[in-house]
């Protein structure tokens, strides 16, 4: 998607989320805007568009590699995150390494990393993976994450959901209009 196309779509969604956009009596539902860190290509555009429309969003943060060659939770992004905090947005975990929870087996969960390697995580390791962005975000902004998390790729397992809940994080999935290849993949539980 081109930057121009992305900007137009983002502006439309942000406009719908503003107080003026939802003040219509016929519209009784709430629209929640959420963004995952990704490669941060559109980070500034997202921030500008949200500010222009006075819209708030929830950002799910992971320490992902950015187009600049650093990571989204490196100190080089501190000013960006501090500004979003000052604007009143909400923040949740998108896991530290942005891996994919693949399958539960006995008391372990298979976790595939971005480089293709697979690890097995117990409940404590699952919690550590979800909590680690909170520690870094606090270092960068002085603010803790909200007790929310979103599984990378929308992939959860029964064990990851249970472990995350036990360590205080509520899972927030994607809407059916997310960017997954098929509707069936949305919040798919593997295992």
Predicted regions and their residues:
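Bacterial N-terminal signal peptides that target proteins for export
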Residues: 1-11
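Bacterial N-terminal signal peptides
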Residues: 11-21
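Active-site beta->alpha N-cap acidic-glycine motif
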Residues: 24-105, 114, 129-147
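Charged, glycine/proline-rich intrinsically disordered loops and linkers
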Residues: 102-121, 187-191
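A substrate-binding/cap region within the structured catalytic cores of diverse enzymes
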Residues: 119-126, 159, 163
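Basic- and aromatic-lined ligand-binding clefts that recognize polyanionic substrates
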Residues: 140-164
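His/Asp/Glu-enriched short active-site or ligand-binding loop at hydrolase and phosphoryl-transfer sites
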Residues: 155, 160-191
């Amino acid at each position: 998607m081109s930057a121009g196309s992305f900007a137009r779509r983002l502006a439309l969604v942000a406009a719908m989320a503003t107080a003026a956009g939802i003040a219509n009596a016929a519209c009784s539902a709430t629209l929640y805007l959420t963004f995952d860190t990704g490669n941060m290509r559109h980070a500034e555009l997202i921030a500008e568009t949200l500010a222009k429309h006075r819209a708030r969003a929830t950002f799910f943060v992971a320490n992902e590699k950015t187009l600049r060659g650093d990571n989204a939770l490196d100190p080089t992004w501190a000013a960006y995150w501090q500004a979003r905090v000052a604007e009143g947005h909400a923040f949740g975990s998108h896991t530290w390494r942005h891996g994919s929870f693949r399958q539960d087996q006995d008391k372990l969960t298979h976790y595939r990393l971005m480089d293709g390697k697979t690890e097995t995580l117990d409940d404590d390791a699952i919690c550590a993976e979800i909590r680690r962005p909170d520690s870094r975000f606090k270092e960068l902004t002085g603010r803790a994450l909200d007790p929310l998390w979103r599984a990378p790729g929308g992939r959860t397992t029964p064990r990851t959901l249970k472990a995350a809940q036990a360590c205080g994080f509520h899972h927030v999935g994607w809407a059916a209009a997310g960017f997954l290849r098929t509707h069936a993949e949305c919040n798919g539980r593997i295992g």
